[in-house]
């Protein structure tokens, strides 16, 4: 038959829609999916005679014999070499601004950078003040944090678009550590008693000159800056030792669930400000539930003025935020609603004398200028060292993921290692200037990108806006109610809380990811932020192990007129050769799933142990001359075969999906091969990757004369099996 007269062979899915046939070029292969898994072995006779298939021989590359000592010496020599070129590259690599700033296109980019920097700066002013409360700090420290982070990332960062500064989840984690250490030190956690003269519901002694006395606010920033310093050290160390792989264990589902769970805790911590209640911040396991219990127990003490102010701010902020998102493609810049609300609320509080008349909680005095730098408290390091680990991992994971996301979107590359250095120094250096932990923030990054940002020069503009506030405008926020700041914080949680909308889609795509999301979210919200992250990571790793412990297995069939093998449980019209079964195991073979591998292989083919036992039993009964049918054993091992099990002569194990073997995996393959050979069935391995081949060689799976049991393709293994059966005089009606 000529090639022109042949029709293309089409394998269509069993669950395909009938009557929807479309013409396909003859060169295309179409597989028809099975409706449900099946182990029926349908035989299709082939008209072509058996043709020889030559063995493939490949010579492996020679491996270098460099030992560990030589490797270390070589690396040290390479790292310790010094030359002007290498010194220049090192400096330019550490300070990326030296690379891109001389090439900066002023006419093309300056307008977008100035606009985006100004807008982000305007948004950061109220958010920095609001998030300071979340971190248990004075408003001035939030402004310091955003200012220094913007400048340092401008010098060290490789992303053109991300906005580095305060981030709600990190502020929450810092605040929990601060409250715990304040409680240990004997400070009152109900009233905020700043050392800079801020007005509070409680009375405290103020001290700005004596180093011997440190009030609550002073001690709070000591704790915050010490945690920040340690988190930065961890991040720089991870960059130096190139252990950024840690972020691999923080999947998108895990991070999303963690942020959503933490958002509930943030919302809960800010609810007292909306109601004007003076409550201690609950910490530890179940803090969210404890806080709500305290709120409802004290609900009768609600400050009506604060409540009305909160409702009015919500009525303004929520709709305008939604309008900003809905019309962001038409708006050249988002409406700075938060700043408008802050200004209006400050004026209303000042001229209405709300604090004097209704005892509302206000921000109080915010000083201008900068405080002298001060080192973190080294005595606190043992107490906060563990807390800083989780904070550092979350900070760099979010920063690196956002950097890579926006770099991919805009067609440039970022250096993940340099990003860890950048965010690390954004924490180390500001920790000496009374700042707390920072990272990239998605909401502000989206605003920055949508308003025309082209480079990190926009970060300088943001810093200039904050500098203006720090030097001139800050005292004007004296009468700003804390309830307004709480509303701003809660409104900015909308993005994280909207993740619930994505759950149906996530469930359809991956049920395992959805379960990880729920476990992480619930544990972060109901147990604690740090334990929630740990539980999420452990559960995520458990899910990975579970997937490899119960992997997918299938028997393969040949696609007609090709050398392609596919799962017979997934596709129709596949050829199964008599006497040969091809088994695929889709997972690494190691100690966790070795028993699953054996049981699945025995179920899909036959159990050699039971067959051997039946043969011995038959021999004792002296019925060797009669054929052994083993019909009872077939039922016992649940194998549905369309022919006598003992007609099976060869099992080919497709190793293409086996990424690696450990010692237990090699022993399992040896055991399986030995058991099958005991009943006259040969076992062949096909498509082993170089790593698996190397493991088999080191594990002495094959002797020198048995190297022919390893094949580079399944088709080659099948051809070898049929040839060996023909040589033994076994009738094979269908050749390859």
From Swiss-Prot:
Modification note: N-glycosylated.
MF (Gene Ontology): bicarbonate transmembrane transporter activity; chloride transmembrane transporter activity; oxalate transmembrane transporter activity; secondary active sulfate transmembrane transporter activity; solute:inorganic anion antiporter activity; sulfate transmembrane transporter activity
Residues found modified as Phosphoserine: 12, 16
Family annotation (InterPro entries): S04_transporter_CS (IPR018045), SLC26A/SulP_dom (IPR011547), SLC26A/SulP_fam (IPR001902), STAS_dom (IPR002645), STAS_dom_sf (IPR036513)
Region annotation Disordered: where it falls in the sequence: 1-28
Chain segments annotated as transmembrane: 114-134, 139-159, 229-249, 257-277, 380-400, 422-442, 457-477, 526-546
Membrane topology: Multi-pass membrane protein
Gene3D superfamilies for this protein: STAS domain
Reactions catalysed, as given in the entry: oxalate(in) + sulfate(out) = oxalate(out) + sulfate(in); sulfate(out) + 2 chloride(in) = sulfate(in) + 2 chloride(out); oxalate(out) + 2 chloride(in) = oxalate(in) + 2 chloride(out); bromide(in) + chloride(out) = bromide(out) + chloride(in)
One GO cellular component, as annotated: plasma membrane
UniProt record, GO biological process: chloride transmembrane transport; chondrocyte differentiation; chondrocyte proliferation; sulfate transmembrane transport
Glycan-bearing residues: 201, 207
Location(s) in or outside the cell: Cell membrane; Apical cell membrane
Record keywords, A-Z: Cell membrane, Glycoprotein, Membrane, Phosphoprotein, Transmembrane, Transmembrane helix, Transport
Residues making up the signal peptide according to the UniProt record: none
Keyword Manganese: no
Domain STAS: 570-721
Function, in words: Sulfate transporter which mediates sulfate uptake into chondrocytes in order to maintain adequate sulfation of proteoglycans which is needed for cartilage development. Mediates electroneutral anion exchange of sulfate ions for oxalate ions, sulfate and oxalate ions for chloride and/or hydroxyl ions and chloride ions for bromide, iodide and nitrate ions.
Stated family: Belongs to the SLC26A/SulP transporter (TC 2.A.53) family.
Name used for this protein in its record: Sulfate transporter
Source organism phylogeny: Eukaryota, Metazoa, Chordata, Craniata, Vertebrata
Gene that this sequence comes from: SLC26A2
């Amino acid at each position: 038959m000529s090639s022109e007269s042949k029709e293309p062979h089409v394998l269509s899915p069993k669950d395909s829609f009938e009557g929807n046939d479309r013409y396909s070029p003859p060169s295309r292969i179409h597989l028809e999916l099975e409706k449900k898994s099946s182990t029926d072995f349908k035989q299709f006779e082939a008209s072509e005679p058996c043709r020889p298939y030559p063995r493939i021989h490949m010579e492996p590359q020679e491996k270098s014999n460099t030992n560990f000592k030589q490797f270390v010496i070589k690396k040290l020599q390479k790292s310790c070499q010094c030359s002007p070129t290498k010194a220049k590259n090192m400096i330019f690599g550490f300070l990326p601004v030296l690379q891109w700033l001389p090439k900066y296109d002023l006419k093309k980019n300056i307008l977008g950078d100035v606009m985006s920097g100004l807008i982000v700066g305007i948004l950061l002013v109220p958010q920095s003040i609001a998030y300071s409360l979340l971190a248990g700090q004075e408003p001035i420290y939030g402004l310091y944090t955003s200012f220094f982070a913007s400048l340092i990332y401008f010098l060290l960062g490789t992303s053109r678009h991300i906005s580095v500064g305060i981030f709600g989840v990190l502020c929450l984690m810092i605040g929990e550590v601060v409250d715990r250490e304040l409680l240990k030190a004997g400070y009152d956690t109900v009233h905020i008693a700043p050392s800079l003269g801020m007005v509070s519901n409680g009375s405290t002694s103020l001290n700005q000159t004596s180093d011997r006395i440190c009030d609550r606010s002073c001690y709070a920033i000591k704790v915050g800056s010490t945690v920040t310093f340690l988190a930065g050290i961890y991040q720089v160390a991870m960059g130096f030792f190139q252990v950024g792989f840690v972020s691999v264990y923080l999947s998108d589902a895990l991070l999303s669930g963690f942020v959503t769970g933490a958002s509930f805790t943030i919302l809960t911590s800010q609810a007292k400000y909306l109601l004007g209640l003076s409550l201690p911040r609950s910490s530890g396991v179940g803090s969210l539930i404890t806080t709500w219990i305290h709120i409802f127990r004290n609900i009768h003490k609600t400050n009506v003025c604060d409540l009305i102010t909160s409702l009015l701010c919500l009525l303004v902020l929520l709709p305008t935020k939604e309008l900003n998102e809905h019309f962001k493609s038409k708006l050249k810049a988002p409406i700075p609603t938060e700043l408008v609300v802050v200004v209006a609320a400050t004026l209303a509080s000042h001229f209405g004398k709300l604090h004097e008349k209704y005892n509302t909680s206000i921000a109080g005095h915010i000083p201008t200028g900068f405080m002298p730098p001060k080192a973190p408290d080294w005595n606190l390091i043992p107490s906060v060292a563990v807390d800083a680990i989780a904070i550092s991992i979350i900070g760099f994971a979010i920063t690196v993921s956002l950097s890579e996301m926006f770099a991919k979107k805009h067609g440039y590359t970022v250096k993940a290692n340099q990003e860890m250095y950048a965010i690390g120094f954004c924490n180390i250096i500001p920790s000496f200037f009374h700042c707390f932990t920072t990272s990239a923030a998605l909401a502000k990054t989206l605003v920055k990108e949508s308003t025309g940002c082209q480079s990190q020069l926009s970060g300088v503009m943001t810093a200039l806006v904050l500098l203006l506030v720090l030097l001139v405008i800050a005292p004007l926020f004296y009468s700003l109610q804390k309830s307004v700041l709480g509303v701003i914080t809660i409104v900015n949680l909308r993005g994280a809380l909207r993740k619930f909308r994505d759950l149906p889609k996530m469930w359809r795509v991956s049920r395992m990811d959805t379960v990880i999301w729920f476990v992480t979210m619930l544990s972060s919200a109901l147990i604690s932020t740090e334990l929630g992250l740990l539980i999420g990571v452990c559960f995520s790793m458990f899910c990975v192990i579970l997937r490899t412990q119960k992997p997918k297995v299938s028997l393969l069939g040949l696609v007609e007129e090709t050398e392609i093998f596919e799962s017979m449980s997934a596709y129709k019209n596949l050829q199964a050769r008599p006497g040969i079964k091809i088994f695929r195991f889709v997972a690494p073979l190691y100690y966790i799933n070795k028993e699953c591998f054996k049981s699945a292989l025995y179920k899909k083919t036959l159990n050699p142990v039971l067959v051997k036992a039946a043969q011995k039993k038959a021999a004792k009964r002296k019925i060797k001359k009669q054929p052994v049918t083993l019909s009872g054993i077939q039922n016992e091992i649940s194998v549905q075969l369309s022919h006598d099990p003992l007609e099976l002569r060869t099992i080919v194990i497709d190793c293409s999906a086996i990424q690696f073997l450990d010692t237990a995996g090699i022993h399992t393959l040896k055991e399986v091969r030995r058991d099958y050979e005991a009943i006259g069935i040969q076992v062949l391995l096909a498509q082993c990757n170089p790593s698996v081949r190397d493991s088999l060689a080191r594990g002495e799976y094959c002797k020198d004369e048995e190297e022919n049991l390893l094949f580079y393709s399944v088709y080659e293994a099948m051809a070898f099996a049929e040839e060996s059966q023909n040589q033994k005089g076994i009738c094979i009606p269908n050749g390859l």
